[in-house]
Amino acid sequence: MIKILFKAIFISVIFASCTGKDSEKGMEITISGKIFNKENAVVSLQAWADTLNTTIPVELNASTGDFSKKLTIQEPGFYRLFLSEGIFADLILFKNDIRVDVDENNRITVSGSPEMDLISRIDSLRDSFDLSPGMVALNEDFSKAVDSNDEVAIEQVRERYQGLLKDFNNQIAAQITEASPSIGVIQILSGNTLDRDEYFSVYEQVAEKFSGEWLDYSLVREFTEKVKMLKITAIGSVAPEINLPDPTGKFVKLSDFRGKYVLVDFWAKWCGPCRRENPNLVKAYNKFKGENFEVIGVSLDRNKEDWMQAIAEDGLSWVHVSDLKYFNSVAARDYNINAIPFSLLIDPNGIIVAKSLRGEALHRTLEKYLKPGA
């Protein structure tokens, strides 16, 4: 499938909403271009947020391959322009006219919009990173390490990769910070191009730059509100209080454990990934439990019997609390939980220091802050 190099950016459009703004005039935009291989080409446009999959036909000159479509939009939005079978371009429409050309090799070029120019720059950076001498050498060394089953060498290659990736992500962060405010930046960040925990300060900086007329657009409002929600559990934030009943009905507060490191683990009996991770969590708890460390399991079950059964079956000997309200749990709402398993490590002062700890990452993080059995 041939498409503009949006890579993973359009895979996870968590902020995409194209609901109309109260405006009689709207924004008039013309999408035009030329398809070199015009035989059997059929051009149409579709909004990403259109759950009805309504397509807007675009007139194509069959003899020249030229096409053009003028439309009026009330909001900036994300669209897919279908050009021919298996060929499409993902577009951000906002104020500026856009030109889309397809050459004889079916390569797509998009121009005319600062939002699309930003996407192109990010894609170029990504291509340069993938083909850089450092990455080429890294891939060669990784293949050798795997072929020889050298676990030490494999780990060394992974560490080198993290260093290269950090440098690359810093370049991306600089680009989008400089380009803000921009609808293109919202699209890039919505695709998880930058880790939300490690680069949350970038999300905040971008959100702060959207003000005034920018806030007339629902996409921008949703983005800024999402950043506010993310801040609740951002690393460095004070963990919200938890005050829920344990299996005996006694209420337990997170603040009761101040002075200790506390791993808060959101889970449930019905959650397969949670249950598969529990043996790893048991191993970590048995290794590090002591005066300075505790685990609080927050169950999103609905039935107490199910909750108790899972605790017993998995041998979970730490503190357990639940109001048995599924994702409507007050703790789930306060922590903005929309998927489990989810965990946070909270320091003795109540500050979130790590998140989403699973597998070996859990053990490495606990070793960073604790001594076994301390």
Question: Predicted segment positions?
Answer:
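Conserved helix-turn-beta segment immediately C-terminal to the redox Cys motif
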Residues: 214, 276-298, 368-371
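Sec-dependent signal peptide recognition
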Residues: 2-11
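A non-transmembrane, solvent-exposed segment enriched in polar/low-complexity residues
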Residues: 20-170
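Short, internal strand/loop/helix patches
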Residues: 308-342, 346-349
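N-terminal "domain-start" segment that seeds a small globular fold
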Residues: 221-254, 318, 364-367, 371-372
